[in-house]
Amino acid sequence: MTMSNYQRQLFAKHQQLHALLRPFSAPKIRIYPSPEKHYRMRAEFRIWRDDEQLFYAMSRGGALTAQNIVRLHNFPPAYITIDRCMPLLLDALRADPVLHHKLYEVHFLASLRGELLVSLIYHRALTDEWTAAAKALAKRFHILLIGRSRKQKITLERDFILETLNVDGRAFHYHQYEQSFSQPNAYVCQKMLRWACAQAGENAGDLLELYCGNGNFTLPLASHFRRVLATEISKSSITALQENIFLNQTNNIAVARLSAEEFTQAWQKERDFYRLKQAGIELADYQFETVFVDPPRAGIDDNTLFLLQKFPKIIYISCNPHTLAANLQTLTQTHELCAAALFDQFPDTPHIECGVVLRKK
């Protein structure tokens, strides 16, 4: 059997990750593939004008110019509700001067539940006339709609979608906000959640989660621990997390608005934080058996790495295997790698999402 183009890409990613993890005596890497199309739950496009015609546009690389533009009517990598809506929405925008005048970008955000939120971004102020036309458009296409321009945002119904992810037979519900981070590939995200829960096992102790975002991992992992302390610095992410905790009726998660660096200072008693007292959090009450981290592409700072070395078990999700490998230089001084996985969140791109588990030697 010959390999498909997707299988070749995935094999190349596996080889790259294997080479990066080989110095740390990594076990066999489990591979979690993506559907080959209709996997992206969010997509953003420029609007391009050509002879009074409107097109969705992407760049072949670099700045968007007439020489490197890719004109689109639909986008097969996008989730089916986005892909089907794109050409119909474009026709409707073309036909209405109020809606297409100085329209600059269109952003789509979809959920497996079938909800679709569309953001229209303009280089002009939005008027009552625009609002009336936008309401008619939203009703016609059964979508949530937001209009944006400089210092202006008009939300016609709400600025988030409802998502439901299934993990080992249990449904977890999320508010996913426009302009806030959420996992772009819901199919692979569910595989990541199942893997993380399997690695967590059943624990009598507590979980520390750094960089928790909107609670994507927090909620499924909470059922595997006595208590969870989740930290995040973004106020908008914390708002979404608290809503999602309420939505799922989870009662063993405490939330601290701290960066990873600030938590390290608090844990090592280098600094007192009023935010912890305000939330009623006493760090001395926790018995952390596991720490879960999903850091930004830059990886984890040195002080936080030294903090992680104190915990028996580390589950590390990475969107940049190169910074993961750099962080493992420190973490494997005290821990050994006992599990590794590749999650293909981004087919047809060189990006690699991966996870590792480390146990104290």
Curated annotation (Swiss-Prot):
One of its GO terms (cellular component) is cytosol. It catalyses: uridine(54) in tRNA + S-adenosyl-L-methionine = 5-methyluridine(54) in tRNA + S-adenosyl-L-homocysteine + H(+); uridine(341) in tmRNA + S-adenosyl-L-methionine = 5-methyluridine(341) in tmRNA + S-adenosyl-L-homocysteine + H(+). PROSITE patterns: SAM_MT_RNA_M5U (PS51687), TRMA_1 (PS01230). It is an enzyme of class 2 (transferase). Coiled coil: none annotated. GO terms for biological process: tRNA methylation. It comes from the Bacteria. The active site is at C319, E353. GO terms for molecular function: rRNA binding; tRNA (uracil(54)-C5)-methyltransferase activity, S-adenosyl methionine-dependent; tRNA binding. The keyword Transferase applies. The keyword RNA-binding does not apply. HAMAP family: RNA_methyltr_TrmA. Belongs to the class I-like SAM-binding methyltransferase superfamily. RNA M5U methyltransferase family. TrmA subfamily. Dual-specificity methyltransferase that catalyzes the formation of 5-methyluridine at position 54 (m5U54) in all tRNAs, and that of position 341 (m5U341) in tmRNA (transfer-mRNA). NCBIfam families: trmA_only. This is tRNA/tmRNA (uracil-C(5))-methyltransferase. The lineage of its organism: Bacteria, Pseudomonadati, Pseudomonadota, Gammaproteobacteria, Cardiobacteriales.
